[in-house]
């Protein structure tokens, strides 16, 4: 049995700009946490969502994932409101933003990915990024159903997740 723990870092909320000094301190903190990695527990890096991460932070997370040979976990396109928020502040969707920044690749675990279109599915597949499906949380919050069949048809790897306690009464994925 194996699992992963994610250290989430956030440096903004949509539209308020980033905090470069905070971004610079992330590696020092993550390197300390990463030392706790074992054969059974991997340590991932991430941000709670596109809304809580500046472009600078998204690029920094990718750099750290490469350096530490780990994954980046991030909530994307969970609900239509998250997609619309990203469009308002960044003039694009979350998946397109990651692609435009040049960070969308095999290191990225895209949590939820409910409100994505066929072109985004193709980009996810081409990048070999993964989607983490959280059906219980998605049902509780009413954000919709991820396009699992379309993702599967595109050969995207789909994992099963529980989301967080704030969006789910349990972290039991079964």
Which residues are covered by each model-predicted region?
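Active-site-adjacent C-terminal substructures of enzyme catalytic domains
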Residues: 103-174
């Amino acid at each position: 049995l194996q699992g992963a723990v994610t250290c989430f870092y956030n440096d903004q909320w949509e539209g308020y700009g980033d905090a470069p000094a905070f971004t610079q301190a992330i590696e020092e903190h993550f390197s300390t946490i990463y030392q706790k990695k074992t054969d059974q527990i991997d340590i991932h890096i991430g941000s709670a969502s596109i809304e809580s991460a500046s472009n600078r932070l998204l690029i920094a997370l990718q750099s750290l994932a490469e350096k530490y040979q780990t994954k980046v976990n991030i909530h994307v396109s969970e609900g239509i409101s998250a997609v619309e928020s990203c469009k308002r502040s960044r003039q694009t969707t979350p998946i397109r933003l990651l692609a435009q920044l040049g960070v969308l690749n095999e290191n990225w675990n895209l949590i939820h990915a409910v409100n994505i279109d066929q072109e985004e599915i193709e980009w996810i597949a081409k990048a070999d990024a993964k989607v983490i499906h959280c059906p219980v949380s998605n049902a509780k919050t009413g954000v919709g159903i991820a396009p699992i069949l379309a993702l599967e048809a595109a050969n995207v790897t789909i994992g099963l997740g529980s989301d967080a306690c704030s969006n789910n009464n349990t972290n039991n994925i079964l």
